[in-house]
Amino acid sequence: MQVLKINPRGYCYGVVDAMVIARNAALDKTLPRPIYILGMIVHNKHVTDAFEEDGIITLDGDNRLEIIEQVESGTVIFTAHGVSPEIRDIAKRKGLVSIDATCPDVTVTHDLIREKSAEGYDIIYIGKKGHPEPEGAIGVAPDHVHLVQSSNDIDSLNLTNDKLLVTNQTTMSQWDVAHLMDSLKEKFPHIEVHKEICLATQVRQEAVAQQAGEADLLIVVGDPKSNNSNRLTQVSVEIAGTPSYRIADVSELKIDWLKGINKVAVTAGASTPTPIVKEVISFLDQFDENDPSTHVIKRTVTLDKILPKIKTPKPVDKIMPHK
C-alpha cells in the first residue's frame, strides 16, 4: 500500500520537556516518595503506563482540585497542560514538593491572563470544556475569564467592560479559533485579540490541511484524550476533505477501513510516542488487500521503548512546601 508520511508529526518540544522532567524526577533519589502526576503528564496512555513502570503514579479525576485531594505526602508533578495558582498553593500547604512540567507556551497564556486581569480586563478564553489546559488558565483569574467553546457560548456572553481580550487553548483547531474570534470581533469590535495556537499544533494542522488531500484516507495516531490529535482528524475531514480515523496504536486499526484504498496518509498527535507511530507505518507499508498474510495486526512495542532515554540525570527544579 502507498503510505504518505505527513511531516511534521508526533512529539512537540513541550511534551518532550515534560517527559524529560518526569524521568529525571524518577531518577532523583532526593525527592520525597511517592511521586504523583496530577492527571496525565501528556494525553497519551502509553506514556502514563510507561511512567508507572518508572514508579511514578498518574492520578486521575474530573479536575486538578479533586486529584490533589488524593495526595497526602510526597512529590507532585504538574502536567504540561498547566495548573491554577490555587493548586500550587494547596500543594505547598499540604507540605508537598512540587515539580512544574507546564509547557512554556501555556505559561505565556497564564502570564497574559495574569497581567491583563490585573489591568481590569475581562478575558474570553476559547477552549474545550473539561480539558485541563482551560481549567488551569481560567484558574489564574477566575472572576475575569469566560470560557467559550462554540458560537452559542458567544451569543450568551453579556459583557459591558470596555477592556476586553480574547485568547485561546494552545491545541485548538486554528480554523475554529479564527472563526470564533471573527464572531467575537463582530459582537465586541473593541476586543483585543491574542491568538495563542502553539507553533507545533499549527504546523501539524497545516501539514494535514495541505497534504491529506493527496490520500484516500488519513490515519491519525493519538490518544482519545489528546485534543491536538482529535483536531488533526477534524482538519483532515473539514479542510482537506479526506476521511480520517484516530487510533491509539496499531491494534485499533480496522482492515475494513483499508479496503479499496490506494494511498493512505499517516500523522500523529504531539504526545504520541514515535515507536507507536512507526509500528502503524510499518503495518501499512506492508499491507496488501489481496494478501491475507499482511492483515495480521499485532502491537509489539513494549513500555520500555516509550520514554526518552536519560544518559545523564539532572536534578529537577523543586518548588518547596510552606514550612
From Swiss-Prot:
Transmembrane segments: none annotated. InterPro entries: LytB/IspH. Keywords: 4Fe-4S, Iron, Iron-sulfur, Isoprene biosynthesis, Metal-binding, Oxidoreductase. It catalyses: isopentenyl diphosphate + 2 oxidized [2Fe-2S]-[ferredoxin] + H2O = (2E)-4-hydroxy-3-methylbut-2-enyl diphosphate + 2 reduced [2Fe-2S]-[ferredoxin] + 2 H(+); dimethylallyl diphosphate + 2 oxidized [2Fe-2S]-[ferredoxin] + H2O = (2E)-4-hydroxy-3-methylbut-2-enyl diphosphate + 2 reduced [2Fe-2S]-[ferredoxin] + 2 H(+). (2E)-4-hydroxy-3-methylbut-2-enyl diphosphate binds at residues 43, 81, 131, 170, 226, 228, 271. The keyword Signal does not apply. [4Fe-4S] cluster binds at residues 12, 103, 198. Its cofactor is [4Fe-4S] cluster. Binds 1 [4Fe-4S] cluster per subunit. GO terms for molecular function: 4 iron, 4 sulfur cluster binding; 4-hydroxy-3-methylbut-2-enyl diphosphate reductase activity; metal ion binding. Pathway: Isoprenoid biosynthesis; dimethylallyl diphosphate biosynthesis; dimethylallyl diphosphate from (2E)-4-hydroxy-3-methylbutenyl diphosphate: step 1/1; Isoprenoid biosynthesis; isopentenyl diphosphate biosynthesis via DXP pathway; isopentenyl diphosphate from 1-deoxy-D-xylulose 5-phosphate: step 6/6. Its EC number is 1.17.7.4. Dimethylallyl diphosphate binds at residues 43, 81, 131, 226, 228, 271. Isopentenyl diphosphate binds at residues 43, 81, 131, 226, 228, 271. Belongs to the IspH family. Catalyzes the conversion of 1-hydroxy-2-methyl-2-(E)-butenyl 4-diphosphate (HMBPP) into a mixture of isopentenyl diphosphate (IPP) and dimethylallyl diphosphate (DMAPP). Acts in the terminal step of the DOXP/MEP pathway for isoprenoid precursor biosynthesis. This is 4-hydroxy-3-methylbut-2-enyl diphosphate reductase. It comes from Lysinibacillus sphaericus (strain C3-41). The lineage of its organism: Bacteria, Bacillati, Bacillota, Bacilli, Bacillales.
